Amino acid sequence: MSSLGELLNQRTREGDVYDRLEREWVRCHACGHDCAIPPGAVGVCKVRYNDHGRLQVPWGYVAGVQCDPIEKKPFFHAWPGALAYSFGMLGCDLHCAYCQNWVTSQALRDPAATAPPRDVDPQWLAADAVRLGARVVVSTYNEPLITVEWAVAVFRAARALGLATGFVSNGNATPQVLDYLTPWIDVYKVDLKSFNDRQYRKLGGRLQPILDTIRSLHARGVWLEIVTLLVPGFNDSDEELKALTEFLVSVSPEIPWHVTAFHRDYRMTDTAATTASQLRRAAAMGQQAGLQHVYAGNLPGVVGDFEDTRCASCAELLVERFGYHIQGYHVTADGACPACRTPVPGRWDTGFAGQAIDRPFLPYDRTRRLS
């Protein structure tokens, strides 16, 4: 039986986001590590490798596919109520001890991460998204920057069928990969995991590339939402949250910030779960810093109105939510507040036809059978 590494090596093609160096070395620009890779070696991500001076990258498979509410990504200011067709591959450039997707993200790094690849082509995925009624196709689950060539191929097929596209990422990008990617994406969610470089290094990264990515995405006109998983004792100090939210305000006070609750997972099982009061405290700090749209997520019904979208000018209730479910929608057809006509930042459809949330899924983790 072939090993997972052998299976993945059979599902590659030459990459686009790299430079050739002397002595058959290559420089990969898919993520902020900017790996210089000698012949026969792999990058930090474990899935991009140098084959005699050519960078081989993941291609032609998925490890997870699901169609569910876009609010689950979470995107709260992009086509509320729409279905997001989510797909992912294997591998990540970070190694977070609390990763909730470790079975896919830590493949080839952790022997217990063994999600098998399923062969598929971009056109099939795009057509499947249409068949299931999706509005947007999203690359997620593992870190999509390290599989960016495949993501762009799927996005091209999705755009050809009239679908929007999105990225759910740790944001550890480079200017080169953003040049390659951003013509093909409409929305991008960045996980801003900490505002402390020392803590980021514990996860296998650095803070500065993520901050640069956030600034660059906003400058490029990509709709951007930020998520911070609030981990008690790791990134929840007043000082750190104040610095984080002030940074976001300096980029744009219109950027939605989601603060979500940690639960024990993977290798971090001795840290207490985040409480509702801790989420509300962090969210209130975001508001005090000047962010216009702050959300406390994944503890529905106990975080006050931090699940809802309100007008930044007059506080009119625009979108009422309970978890991923929309209970009221009042944004106008042209994306404005009905009370004061202030434009609501985001990506809005001309009408709201209700929320599609029930779709049949077969077992295999978060993956439907691809046949």
Q: How does the language model describe each region?
A:
Residues 50-187, 355-363:
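Conserved Radical SAM active-site core
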Residues 34, 38, 48-51, 95, ...:
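Cys/His-rich metal-chelating microdomains
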Residues 109, 139, 168, 226-227, ...:
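Residue-level detector of family-conserved "landmark" positions at structurally sensitive sites
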Residues 2-83:
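N-terminal juxtadomain amphipathic helix
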